[in-house]
């Protein structure tokens, strides 16, 4: 597994949950002897929705909602076989989307 790197990209709506998951991954990787670059915060995507408050009239009365998607990027530079096994066994929170590229 030498001269490879594992790129982990995490997405979540809750930034606190995302940071907890990132810390778990970093601790696991460092415990097994791998070097970690990051976490690098990527730009937050903000989706805004504008809806009418009433069902019939009054177009001027609207309500605005927004959904923020927070993202982080981790690079595990020198992974060992123990690192890969530990990352496979790691149980992260349900609200975090994880993408792993080798």
UniProtKB/Swiss-Prot annotation:
InterPro entries: Ribosomal_uS10, Ribosomal_uS10_CS, Ribosomal_uS10_dom, Ribosomal_uS10_dom_sf. GO terms for cellular component: ribonucleoprotein complex; ribosome. Keywords: Ribonucleoprotein, Ribosomal protein. Signal peptide: none annotated. One of its GO terms (molecular function) is structural constituent of ribosome. It comes from the Bacteria. SMART domains: Ribosomal_S10 (SM01403). GO terms for biological process: translation. Belongs to the universal ribosomal protein uS10 family. Involved in the binding of tRNA to the ribosomes. Part of the 30S ribosomal subunit. HAMAP family: Ribosomal_uS10. This is Small ribosomal subunit protein uS10. The lineage of its organism: Bacteria, Pseudomonadati, Thermodesulfobacteriota, Desulfuromonadia, Desulfuromonadales. The gene is rpsJ.
